[in-house]
């Protein structure tokens, strides 16, 4: 499990401090594929860097923290965000954007595998045994083992992306973060990458965190979704709930703007622009674009509230369902006994 607690991640720039994410809190469960969605600049990639512990200037963590809970020989171990970098590859790995810029252009793929796995228990296998394991693993992922002898420029974009996923999952980490894993790939290759990710997650029974601006990617493979807007979490729910019963006006407008098969009706985008994260508004950050907004929305920042079991929304216009109110009443009653 990953617990994200009130994380605020900022950037220092010559124009001022960019509040890329602010007071972000939610939990990522074991054995799930969770998606993080939202417009460009909403804080998705910044949040991924914070979770991975890859925080470098000008980015810094202004508040909050992150905990990874992992099982080590039958005992629970808590890893804080200050320690996460020590457990890269072993417990948590990251599949970044832009496959060509990730792979070293002057090294063969096999050498990049060998350089990545410096853990003593892995290296103890010996080079030839390790290369054989790599070849076997590539076959499992339906990749020809011959790619181990190739240079990155000799592989297609889709093949490079598959190699990066293989690199990230070779030692079966508990958490795999993938940032826009299908960007710049054609539809057929995208489908192959998504199928690969789903099959890997089922095989490894681990947790995948997928960042994508493409709602279709989330619809196809994620179990739950986190919708972000202007550095804040707007909504969290099961993926089917997000698509069938969106509660936040921003999510609703995102879903309404998606094209439908067999529907030639022109879809309207969301009018207006997100607020500047150099000086975000004090109230709801979506208020200036929201059809439900009133004066209170511009002044009061909404909290993330559970409106239905497992369905969280940050909107002053949405209230907990009768079921949630009844549960809260029972909890209060027990507390007063």
For each predicted feature, which ranges?
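The feature captures the beta-strand-to-loop junction immediately N-terminal to the Walker
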Residues: 37-39
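A short, proline-enriched helix->beta-strand linker immediately N-terminal to the Walker B motif
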Residues: 170-174
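Conserved ABC ATPase "signature" region
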Residues: 128-146, 255
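ABC ATPase NBD coupling module
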Residues: 72-93, 119, 241-246, 276-281
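P-loop NTP-binding/switch modules centered on Walker-like glycine-rich loops
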Residues: 181, 185-265
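Short catalytic/signature loops enriched in Gly
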Residues: 236-337
């Amino acid at each position: 499990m990953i617990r994200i607690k009130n994380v605020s991640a900022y950037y220092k720039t010559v124009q001022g401090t960019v509040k890329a994410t602010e007071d972000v809190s939610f939990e990522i469960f074991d054995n799930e594929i969770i998606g993080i969605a939202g417009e460009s600049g909403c804080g998705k990639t910044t949040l991924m860097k914070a979770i991975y512990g890859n925080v470098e200037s000008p980015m810094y963590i202004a508040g909050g923290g992150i905990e990874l809970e992992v099982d080590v020989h039958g005992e629970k171990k808590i890893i804080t965000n200050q320690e996460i970098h020590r457990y890269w590859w072993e417990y948590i790995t990251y599949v970044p954007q832009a496959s060509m810029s990730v792979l070293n252009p002057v090294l063969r793929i096999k050498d990049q595998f060998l350089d990545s796995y410096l853990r003593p228990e892995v290296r103890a296998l010996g080079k030839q045994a390790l290369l054989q394991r790599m070849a076997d693993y590539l076959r499992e992922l339906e990749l020809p083992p011959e790619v181990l002898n190739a240079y990155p420029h000799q592989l297609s974009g889709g093949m490079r992306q598959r190699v990066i996923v293989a690199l990230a999952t070779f030692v079966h980490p508990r958490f795999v973060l993938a940032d826009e894993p299908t960007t710049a790939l054609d539809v057929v290759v995208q489908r192959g990458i998504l199928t690969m990710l789903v099959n890997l997650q089922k095989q490894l029974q681990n947790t995948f965190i997928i960042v994508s601006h493409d709602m279709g990617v989330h619809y196809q493979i994620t179990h739950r979704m986190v919708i972000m807007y202007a550095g804040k979490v707007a909504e969290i729910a099961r993926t089917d709930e997000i698509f069938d019963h969106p509660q936040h006006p921003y999510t609703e407008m995102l879903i309404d703007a998606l094209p439908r098969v067999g529907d030639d009706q022109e879809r309207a985008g969301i009018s207006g622009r997100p607020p500047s994260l150099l000086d975000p508004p004090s109230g709801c950050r979506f208020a200036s674009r929201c059809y439900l907004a009133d004066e209170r929305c511009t002044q009061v920042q909404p909290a993330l509230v559970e409106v239905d079991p497992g369905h969280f929304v940050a909107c002053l216009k949405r209230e907990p369902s009768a079921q949630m109110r009844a549960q809260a009443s029972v909890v209060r009653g027990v507390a007063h006994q």
